[in-house]
Amino acid sequence: LHASLAPSEMCIRDRVLVVGIGPVGLMSVAACKLRGASQIIAVGSRPVCRQAAKYYGATDIITYKEGPIDKHVLDLTNGEGVDKAVIAGGGVDTFDPVIKCLKPGGKIGNVNYLGEGDYVNIPRVEWGVGMGHKQINGGLMPGGRRRIEKLADLITYGRLDVKPLLTHRFDGFEHMEDALMLMRNKADDLIKPVVVFSE
């Protein structure tokens, strides 16, 4: 939640695009809602994640399987585009359509690990030929006790419900490997597994 919130600096009434609605993207959707985004467009295809994105506040959900992301976003925003974007999925080619639907002065927060590809390609014209004031920030969530306490407070005081993320429950430490293998194999109905240790 915090990693996706900070890089693209969402503000009240922003139109925001969240690409990739796995656990990190879903928390990005939740962060956008908490920060007062007026329109939250989520990109994803798995039904369990699309349902969770709606729960967390996505106003629109699109899929890259039905055509270019930028065209969908521009249609949904009457040609205006979005103020901010979070890239939480995809690859090096994801930046191209996101930049194409980002308003001048817009910001992209990348929280996606780019494990393949040599270059991130930036479309020159849609980048404002270098003069569009479009920014890309990327990074991991900063650590520290204070940050974790603030995030825990969101759960404690009912501002954030993480239950929809927990799609698979395992009881006992002996099932840790089962949970990890489930994450590795990425079952269609998986968001996050949880392993519960008995007292």
Residue ranges and their predicted role:
Residues 1-7, 12:
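Single conserved hydrophobic/aromatic residue that forms the stacking wall/gate
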Residues 18-21, 33-97:
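Adenosine-nucleotide cofactor-binding segment
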Residues 25-26:
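N-terminal Rossmann-fold NAD(P) dinucleotide-binding loop
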Residues 96-99, 144-199:
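C-terminal hydrophobic helical "lid"/dimerization subdomain
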Residues 102-104:
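Helix-to-beta-strand junctions that scaffold the AdoMet/dcAdoMet cofactor pocket
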Residues 106-107, 122-165:
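Rossmann-fold dehydrogenase core element
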Residues 111-112:
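Acidic carboxylate diad motif detector
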